Curated annotation (Swiss-Prot):
Keywords: Cytoplasm, Endonuclease, Hydrolase, Manganese, Metal-binding, Nuclease. The gene is rnhB. The keyword rRNA-binding does not apply. InterPro entries: RNase_HII, RNase_HII/HIII, RNase_HII/HIII_dom, RNaseH-like_sf, RNaseH_sf. GO terms for molecular function: manganese ion binding; RNA binding; RNA-DNA hybrid ribonuclease activity. GO terms for biological process: DNA replication, removal of RNA primer; mismatch repair. This is Ribonuclease HII. The keyword Magnesium does not apply.
């Protein structure tokens, strides 16, 4: 049985912000900002990692239907490689908050640091398992990114992206070594860089 967070904790015009995708070797980092409506309860909100895929999908639709405002944003692979993953994540969070159709009086950010925002903000460590709005944001971000990685499975077969979602599992690392990086792999990440350099070495030896 999955028990959700207490919806009575929801405050007026407080945005919850979270990210998914800092650790994977490929794909964008996806963020979401959500302002919940205290008058429209959503049961079962929790850290997206603690929910089944089916529950996340159901909550995704309910959050989109009932939230006062939400925005899903991202930083692309090129931005991650240019800025580094931390700065790209901060940029994506900034985009999510700025994309809200309603201006929050406060943004609560999952983690231990905040992006530069035009509204007051505070970090909340493990916020996705404490603050309903952050939990909602974690669900929107994870479902969005998981759907993208499942789509990439069809575009780049052989890597198992629909299963590991880009994380550095043994299956992914083996495929990376065997097939080489794709255009959506983050070349600033060490395993990808090593695979790229190995491929370059093979190419050079064949010339």
């Amino acid at each position: 049985m999955q028990i959700g967070l207490d919806f009575n904790l929801v405050e007026d015009l407080v945005a919850g912000v979270d990210e998914v995708g800092r650790g994977p070797l490929c794909g964008a980092v996806v963020t979401a900002a959500v302002i919940l409506d205290p008058a429209r309860p959503i049961l079962g909100l929790n850290d997206s990692k603690k929910l089944t895929e089916a529950k996340r999908e159901a909550l995704f639709d309910e959050i989109c239907a009932k939230a006062l405002s939400f925005c899903i944003a991202r930083a692309e692979v090129e931005e991650i490689d240019r800025l580094n993953i931390l700065q790209a994540t901060m940029l994506a969070m900034q985009r999510a908050v700025e994309g809200l159709s309603v201006t929050p009086k406060l943004a609560l950010i999952d983690g231990n640091r905040c992006p530069k925002l035009s509204v007051p903000a505070a970090p909340v460590i493990k916020g996705d398992s404490q603050v309903p709005a952050i939990a909602a944001a974690s669900i929107l971000a994870k479902v969005t990114r998981d759907r993208e990685m499942s789509a990439f499975e069809l575009i780049y077969p052989g890597y198992g992206m629909g299963g590991h979602k880009g994380y550095p599992t043994p299956v992914h690392l083996e495929a990376l070594a065997r097939l080489g990086p794709t255009p959506i792999h983050r070349r600033s990440f060490a395993p990808v860089r090593a695979a790229w350099e190995a491929r370059e070495g093979i190419t050079d030896s064949l010339i």
